[in-house]
Design a protein with these regions (language model features):
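Catalytic cores of nucleophile-dependent amide-cleaving enzymes
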Residues: 1-49, 53
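Active-site proximal loops enriched in glycine and acidic residues that flank catalytic Cys/His/Asp
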Residues: 7-10, 36-39, 67, 78, ...
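A short acidic, amphipathic alpha-helical/loop segment
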Residues: 19-24, 133-137, 165
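Conserved positions within tetratricopeptide repeat
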Residues: 64, 132, 163-167
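Long, helix-rich interaction regions
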Residues: 111-115, 139-149, 157-173
Length: 173
């Protein structure tokens, strides 16, 4: 296995003598990188939020970068990437961009869910996506991942659209 994600406390504690992530990296296998936690971590977090972007060729280190959790680290080679499953522009260049015109291309329903979720995040952070648009996405998207992303972003808005999404979310499966 090339990449291992360990989502538990202390399994990436590189500062200690015994670290589970080190066993994968320095063991006899072929592991190139581990995403692991150094200390106690929140148990109700979305640790694998953008992990699907690995299938589009995202660097493994970006999983930790975009997780938003200080205790999550990439141990090993953060520049390792799998061959992209689909042809598209270079995803790591795209992730480095804050150009709303580029990101707007990936907001549609036919975009892979993880990439669409990242586009939503980027556009929301730039003020280019309104809570009304997020509610529309929440109502219409066939992807549970995209609906969850819309709900998380709506929670930041804390407005009537978030309240409506919460009501709708009760029956979301």
């Amino acid at each position: 296995c090339r990449v291992v994600v360990l989502d538990a406390c202390f399994n990436g504690s590189f500062h200690l003598d015994d670290c589970i992530a080190d066993e994968y990296i320095f063991g006899q296998g072929h592991t190139i990188a581990c995403i692991a936690n150094t200390v106690n971590v929140l148990q109700d977090k979305w640790a694998d939020r953008y992990v699907g972007l690995l299938g589009l060729g995202m660097y493994v280190g970006n999983v930790a970068r975009f997780s938003g959790y200080l205790e999550s680290h990439c141990i090993g080679d953060p520049t390792f990437a799998f061959t992209p499953a689909v042809k598209m522009e270079e995803v790591n260049d795209l992730l480095a961009s804050n150009d709303p015109v580029k990101w707007q291309k990936y907001i549609g329903e036919n975009t892979p869910s993880d990439l669409r979720s990242m586009a939503m995040e980027k556009l929301w952070q730039q003020g280019r996506l309104s809570s009304a648009q997020l509610l529309r996405i929440f109502r219409t998207s066939k992807s549970a991942l995209v609906r969850l992303q819309a709900l998380v972003l709506l929670a930041e808005a804390r407005d009537d659209n978030f309240i409506e999404a919460m009501k709708l979310g009760v029956d979301d499966s």
